[in-house]
């Protein structure tokens, strides 16, 4: 498994950088952990967007999720033009109506996760736990 830091800025990204976004790659599958501001642009330095399979959102502060809509709409365009063949899957907590709008069948799907769920996402086994966030 390989982890590529796409962005690690907090709050607001700097020029040519991105907020929280970490790309996990294993066995030809790609999972993006968070996609804060600037992530959709910076991700393309590591991976063509049509090769991204999954996006896992840890929470809904903008520095962790603001580019999710761009990735969702981008996949719709990519599939309609034939640039991508597979839908993009989003995973996140069900507490935000914004998350539900990421589903645009058959292009994107949003699957909710619970605080203590265990989920197999491609080759990645993900276990979730509720934690305290310092700015909540």
Which residues fall in each region the model found?
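Short beta-turn/strand-loop junction motif enriched in small, turn-promoting residues
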Residues: 8-11, 77-78, 131
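Conserved beta-strand hairpin/beta-sheet module of binuclear metal-dependent hydrolase folds
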Residues: 1-47, 136
